[in-house]
Regions:
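N-terminal Rossmann-like FAD-binding beta1-loop-alpha1 element of flavoenzymes
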Residues: 5-35
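Conserved FAD-binding catalytic core of PHBH/FMO-like flavoproteins
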Residues: 71, 162-165, 170-274, 278-281
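FAD/FMN-dependent oxidoreductases across multiple families
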Residues: 248-342
Length: 416
């Protein structure tokens, strides 16, 4: 027997669960929303509050100040902020050049420029908030194995914990950059390889970071260090994202710890004293992957399935959250006017509202690394003057920070 659901979200990662929370809060109570995830989801916890389990090697995500505003609007920020590391200052520099700039949260009357959160804590907090909300049906482990667009909706077939056939008014595809469902629907992707790899790890320094995030551009590629909460024993931790040529990344993934620390020290310098430890190292190839279509009648492609970005500016997840916020508002307005949620004009309205934000964020993340890696001496001087000039031109610096923090986008019409 075929069941009906107004909205089906395919993908229960951080974007999918955030989307479920947003829609659960903004759509009428009679709206049936399903979340389908291929891996087993955590079970509800008594009291609804997850426990924080610190780990030196925990992977992390940088949330912009704009993302904080979105999570506050969803009502989940109070839970999240128990175990976050605020970014009070951002230091941007260019190795071997004189240009640099400092950005301070206090200059903008913000509590922080952003926050670094461990993925395990973020995921646990969001899923428990979804259980407490009680508006979304979770189907896990299960997978959408067939999706056929029909008049008025999408016919879905699920396999896994619950084998089901569902007629969905709206299908939201949020199953990641390598989305199998996107491919199954015949939505093409545009991929641009950067011919670089990202090396990620957590590192320990002798000195505390004092809430400062570092973005250091080098001729090999950018080095980003994000402040993390201290590990057990008070170890001063930072999350490293190091962009490198594939062969260089491969070597540094496998080399002895002492050699790795020496190489990173030479690239980053001694702003945090001597490097003392590196945790588990991981690497992956970098590419800009964009869905050629984000909306069709009855379908929206979201998160990394829609646009997977270069990590240099940490904008991918924050852009996805802004997409979530705007889609929630557009669908709420459609429901209020009794317009079908999957109507193509409704979905085009969402895409039109987000297009400028998406284009600007993608272009910023795409062009920035190449700009700082080019060795042309005239261009190098212009880069130096540009970084130094941000400190000399407060209005330009404020606008730059507003966009980097995701605040400019969400204060425009159509945003939270």
């Amino acid at each position: 027997m075929t069941e009906y659901a107004d909205v089906v979200i395919a993908g229960g990662g951080m974007v999918g669960v955030s989307l479920a929370l947003q829609l659960g809060a903004s759509l009428p109570p009679q709206t049936r929303i399903l979340l389908v995830e291929g891996f087993p989801l955590p079970q509800p916890i008594a009291g609804g509050k997850p426990e924080y389990h610190p780990s030196f090697d925990a992977r992390s995500t940088a949330l912009s100040f704009g993302s904080r505003l979105i999570y506050e609007h969803m009502g989940v920020w109070e839970d999240l902020e128990q175990w976050l590391c605020p970014i009070d200052t951002i230091h941007v520099s260019n190795k071997g050049r004189f240009g640099s700039t400092l950005m301070h949260a206090v200059d903008y009357d913000w509590p922080a420029l952003g926050y670094v959160v461990e993925n395990a804590w973020l995921g646990s907090s969001l899923i428990q908030a979804l259980y407490r909300q009680g508006r979304v049906e979770l189907i896990s482990p299960a997978k959408v194995v067939s999706a056929v667009v029909r008049a008025g909706g999408v016919a879905l077939r699920l396999e896994g914990a619950r084998a089901m056939e569902i007629e969905a008014g709206l299908l939201l595809v949020a199953d990641g950059a390598n989305s199998g469902l996107r491919d199954q629907l015949g939505v093409a992707v545009e991929e641009k390889s950067y011919r670089q790899h990202a090396l990620i790890a957590n590192v320990a320094f002798a000195e505390p970071h004092r809430g400062c995030a570092y973005e250091r551009f080098t001729d090999e590629g950018p080095v980003a260090l994000l402040p993390l909460l201290a590990a057990a024993g008070g170890t001063h931790r930072a999350g490293l994202v190091w962009t490198l040529a594939p062969e260089r990344a491969e070597h540094l993934l496998k080399c002895p710890e002492a050699e790795f620390l020496e190489c990173l020290q030479e690239r980053f310098g001694y702003r945090l004293g001597r490097l003392q430890q590196v945790g588990e190292r991981h690497g992956y190839p970098l590419a800009l992957v964009q869905s050629a279509e984000q909306v069709r009648s009855g379908i929206v492609v979201m998160g990394n399935a829609a646009h997977a970005l270069h990590p240099v500016a940490g904008q991918g997840y924050n852009l996805a959250l802004r997409d979530v916020a705007v889609l929630g508002q557009v669908l709420a307005a459609a429901a209020q006017s009794s317009t079908p949620l999957g109507h193509i004009q409704v979905l085009k309205q969402y895409h039109d509202l987000q297009k400028a934000d998406q284009d600007q964020t993608v272009n910023f993340s795409d062009k920035l690394p190449a700009l700082f890696m080019r060795t042309d001496p005239i261009l190098g001087l212009l880069r130096d003057l540009g970084l130094a000039g941000l400190d000399l031109l407060p209005a330009a610096k404020r606008e730059f920070v507003r966009h980097a923090a995701g605040v400019a986008a969400i204060t425009e019409p159509g945003h939270v």
